[in-house]
């Protein structure tokens, strides 16, 4: 056996030290500058966004809608950190209260609607001043910054007994993911001139989740004009086909865009990376 001071012993000691240090070096490596953000559509206007840092955002979580991929989703999602509600209508508030009670998710919406949802059972300690705001405000949600932006619609909230409550102003959401994409969820809205300002304020929008159904919101032709204002890389249509009245289709959107943007129709329940 070589002595501790021999060259062979010193080389062996160095090799062992290098092997021991290797896992530490690997774990200290920074994450990629642009990680994978997963977007899952659950039908209608309901989406779940999972960031590279593991933050989970549920947007307009009507998870029991007719286009949902399976029943009982509000009781099955393993983790939700924040629930974003664009306005007070039942098809956007959806299962927010039940989901919040089960997951502990904090509420991001306007202050008036937030107060009404707390009265309806949303846990008060999950709907505080740190996450309730109004149009123009930005909320830090883990590794995502959520800015509330203009939408033209209504926002009355009715509880389970049909009693009307304040719903504040309707809104869309611009979600800037650290190390990931910038997403724009239009909420329910008509075409607005404010959309022209989004690229100036937020830079390139990577993914625009846009209503196209018509009747209550933009139809495909109006949505195509909105896409021209926002200039996203990818357009994901939503809020169509759930009811007979919202009859706009992705095919009509593609035709109206004339190849000016990629239209990507998501399959309910299937995550897609951006």
Curated annotation (Swiss-Prot):
Cysteine pairings via disulfide bonds: none
Keyword terms: Hydrolase
Source lineage: Bacteria, Pseudomonadati, Myxococcota, Myxococcia, Myxococcales
Superkingdom of the organism of origin: Bacteria
NCBIfam families for the chain: PRK00685.1 (NF001911)
Organism from which the protein derives: Anaeromyxobacter dehalogenans (strain 2CP-1 / ATCC BAA-258)
Family annotation (Pfam families): Lactamase_B_3 (PF13483)
SUPFAM superfamilies: Metallo-hydrolase/oxidoreductase
Signal sequence coordinates: none
Protein family: Belongs to the UPF0173 family.
Protein's recorded name: UPF0173 metal-dependent hydrolase A2cp1_1196
Keyword Membrane included in the entry's annotation: no
Molecular function GO terms recorded: hydrolase activity
């Amino acid at each position: 056996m070589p002595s501790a001071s021999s060259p062979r012993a010193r080389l062996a000691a160095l090799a062992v030290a290098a092997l021991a240090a290797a896992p530490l070096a690997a774990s200290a490596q920074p994450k990629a500058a642009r990680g994978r953000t997963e977007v899952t559509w659950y039908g209608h206007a309901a989406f779940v966004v999972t960031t590279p840092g593991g933050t989970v955002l549920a947007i307009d979580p009507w998870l029991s809608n007719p286009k949902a991929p399976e029943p009982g989703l509000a009781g099955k999602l393993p983790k939700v950190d924040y629930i974003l509600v664009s306005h007070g209508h039942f098809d956007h508030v959806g299962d927010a209260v039940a989901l919040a009670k089960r997951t502990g998710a904090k509420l991001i919406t306007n202050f008036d609607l937030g107060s009404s949802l707390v009265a309806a059972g949303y846990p008060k300690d999950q709907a505080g001043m740190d996450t309730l705001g109004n149009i123009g405000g930005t909320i830090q949600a883990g590794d995502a910054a959520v800015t509330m932006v203009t939408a033209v619609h209504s926002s009355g909230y009715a509880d389970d007994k049909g009693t009307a409550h304040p719903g504040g102003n309707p809104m869309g959401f611009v979600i800037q993911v650290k190390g990931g994409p910038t997403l724009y969820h239009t909420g329910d809205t008509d075409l607005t001139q404010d959309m022209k300002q989004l690229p100036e304020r937020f830079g390139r929008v990577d993914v625009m989740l846009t209503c196209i159904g018509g009747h209550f919101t933009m139809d495909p032709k109006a949505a195509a004009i909105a896409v021209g204002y926002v200039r996203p890389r990818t357009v994901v249509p939503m809020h169509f086909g759930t009811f007979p009245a919202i009859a706009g289709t992705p095919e009509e959107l593609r035709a109206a865009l004339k190849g000016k943007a990629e239209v990507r129709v998501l399959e309910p329940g299937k995550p897609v990376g951006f």
